[in-house]
A protein has these predicted regions:
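Elongated, mostly alpha-helical coiled-coil "stalk/stator" tethers of large membrane protein machines
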Residues: 1-179
Length: 179
């Protein structure tokens, strides 16, 4: 994440917190980010310097006025005016990071060799909440190369309980063992 994204995303969070709009702005940013991720040509158009700023601002108004909070629309216009609209995704990440910190939320991804049943995901979430004392937002992903077990991806570290990891550890130990 760039310094620009941290600065702008943090400033937007500060404003939203001051106005008690954290949840609404978070939802709007997620929606805008999803649309821009799905429509890279639209983002490219909004970032094209040969298109006058007023025209780009008009395109933003046309697409988003009434669909997102005015703070989000004005934030997008500010990024557009400053030539940093491509940083919106990073700004949204920083906003989410600040939101999670303020609301004691920890995002965790469980990576497994096969898809976990919903009841197992719920048990894992409950166990993580009990251990961390935070609300866990758990997502999952399948990676067949893991063979078995679970890899937990947290913002600041990974907890690797996969079969692949343990096999690599055994291999490393055997390589370093003198017979």
């Amino acid at each position: 994440m760039t310094r620009t994204a941290k600065t702008y995303g943090g400033a937007l969070y500060d404003l939203a917190q001051e106005e008690h709009l954290e949840d609404a702005i978070l939802a709007d940013l997620a929606g805008v980010r999803a649309v821009l991720d799905e429509n890279p040509d639209y983002l490219r158009l909004l970032c094209t310097p040969s298109v006058p700023k007023e025209e780009r601002r008009g395109l933003l108004d046309e697409a988003w006025r009434g669909n997102v909070h005015p703070y989000v629309l004005n934030f997008m216009k500010l990024l557009c005016d400053n030539g940093t609209l491509r940083e919106l995704s990073g700004c949204a990440q920083e906003y989410r990071r600040r939101y999670n910190a303020a609301h004691d939320i920890l995002e965790v991804r469980a990576v497994t060799a096969v898809a976990l049943r919903p009841e197992l995901l719920e048990r894992l979430r409950a166990k993580l909440e009990a251990q961390t004392g935070k609300r866990i937002e758990l997502s999952s992903r399948v990676d067949e190369s893991l063979l078995g077990g679970v890899l937990l991806e947290l913002p600041d570290r990974q907890l690797d309980g996969t079969v692949a990891y343990h096999l690599e550890e055994i291999q490393r130990i055997l390589r370093n063992t003198v017979i």
